[in-house]
Amino acid sequence: MCNVLKISRAAYYKHLHRKPSRYEQENKALDQEIINEYTASKRRYGAPKIHKILENKGLSISLKRVQRRMKKLGIKSIVVKKWKPSCQSKNKTVQKENIIKGDFSAETINKKWLTDITYIYTLKDGWCYLASVFDCCSAKIVGWHMSKTIDADLALQAVKNAVSNQDPDTKGLIIHSDLRSQYTSNKFEKYLEKLSIKHSYSKKGYPYDNAPMESFHSCFKKEDEKMNKYIDFKDAKISIFEYIESWYNRKRIHSRIGYMTPQDYEDLITKSA
């Protein structure tokens, strides 16, 4: 073989017994750390979040290096790019006041909530519906509800659950939704009025007016590996419970809140109050 390769026997054996360099050893250890975090996130995290987690563990590495290693390993986040607004609808409709006017910032929790409904497909029960309530300060899903029917009760129960979970000062709370009939129904409006909650509305055909809420539903549909594979309503509800309560609120870190989880950020705000 040495003759074929035109190298000396000494060089050949030196190559066989060569020890990995320090840099190669570091890369091997780094690769394992990256794979561990990538697997723990169920392939949801890309380089920025994995880099932040490794930094928090005390590893001094650059984002570019994490990106290079992930490319070398052939792994990337299963989440696609964030939603961007499409063309605006030209349909005329009765407009209601948009109080928050695209300002999704909040100095503390339970001051601005966003809510919306999304469609969930199941193999046996067909379309089901998820209504969620998002806190603008913590990025936490403070309340949610699932139903086989899309009606005012679906929208209302999600908000009732949020109020029960958070026990907010409702007189200082704004809740923002689109203009779909579930949110403009007499039942929904009466409940908000009873608790002195101010209702803010997106302009018809402008989903970007509720962007963080839209982003959550989009993110959920990309990150839940069982999406479009739910057997029935019960199966979907269990999976969504696990995603929201076990993963999203308590384990998923967010760049907008300093790479903390929503629950940890809420706890921090509560302790600081």
Which role fits each region the language model picked out?
Residues 138-144, 199-202, 226-227:
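Short small-residue beta-strand/loop micro-motif enriched in glycine and branched aliphatics
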Residues 2, 9-108, 206, 261-270:
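Basic, flexible linker segments flanking DNA-binding modules
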Residues 106-142, 148:
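An active-site-proximal beta-strand-loop segment
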Residues 20, 193-197, 219-273:
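C-terminal domain-tail junction helix/linker
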Residues 1-2, 12, 34, 50, ...:
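Mobile genetic element proteins and their domesticated derivatives, centered on retroelements
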Residues 4-11, 29, 154, 158, ...:
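Generic alpha-helical secondary structure signal
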Residues 145-168:
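Active-site beta-loop-alpha junctions of metal-dependent nucleic acid enzymes
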Residues 89, 177-179, 185-188, 201-221, ...:
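RNase H-like two-metal-ion nuclease catalytic core shared by retroviral integrases
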